[in-house]
Amino acid sequence: MLVIWLLLLALLPEPRVPAATASPRAPRDAGGRGGVYEHLGGAPRRRKLYCATKYHLQIHPGGKINGTLEKNSVFSILEITAVDVGIVAIKGLFSGRYLAMNKRGRLYASENYNTECEFVERIHELGYNTYASRLYRTVPSGASTKRKASAERLWYVSVNGKGRPRRGFKTRRTQKSSLFLPRVLDSKDHEMVRLFHTNVRYRESLLKPPSKNQRRRRGR
């Protein structure tokens, strides 16, 4: 079923991305707390992004982005906030960092919110979403402005079959690695969130850099 849907999706034209507009002042936070986006309303959606490659997207406090096969990983709990029409910012609840894509198409975890943290959220059939950089894309050279706009290729958030992020310019919206299912938090996730907000030792243990053995066990 997924294969048939992907073939149908490949026939559709690339979505047009709203252009980034200059803001009179830099937002302090994309979550509607004292920033310029508070008028867009509502608390962030707390979700886990489950890729069609079977990995949950993780945002680490050290700046790393990857995927995990763990069902309940603290760094896979995310806050997704609307910052413009069809545009979202994705923040790791436990790491406090934003998902971002640089001009080389690499995903990283940014300490501060900036335009590289803005992604076009597109909801597809079967419940899968795609997230494309608002700022960066592949634009063909040597073509007219009108043809360039129609031939632009978006750069997507993508996690491959080994849990590693793919560079944006190598991605396509029809690839399994670019499809994400937003999952609501389960009871264990909610308990981890509660401990994070109420237990100082628990919070400090999570934010402490992992040892070599811990990194080896996490693997992904």
From Swiss-Prot:
- Organism of origin is Gallus gallus (Chicken)
Q: Which GO terms describe its biological process?
A: fibroblast growth factor receptor signaling pathway; negative regulation of cardiac muscle tissue development; neurogenesis; positive regulation of cell division; positive regulation of cell population proliferation; positive regulation of MAPK cascade; regulation of cell migration
- Gene3D superfamilies in alphabetical order: 2.80.10.50
List the GO molecular function terms: fibroblast growth factor receptor binding; growth factor activity
Reading the lineage from the top rank, the first entry is: Eukaryota
Predominant location of this chain? secreted
The family classification in the record reads:
Belongs to the heparin-binding growth factors family.
Descriptive protein name: Fibroblast growth factor 3
Gene that this sequence comes from: FGF3
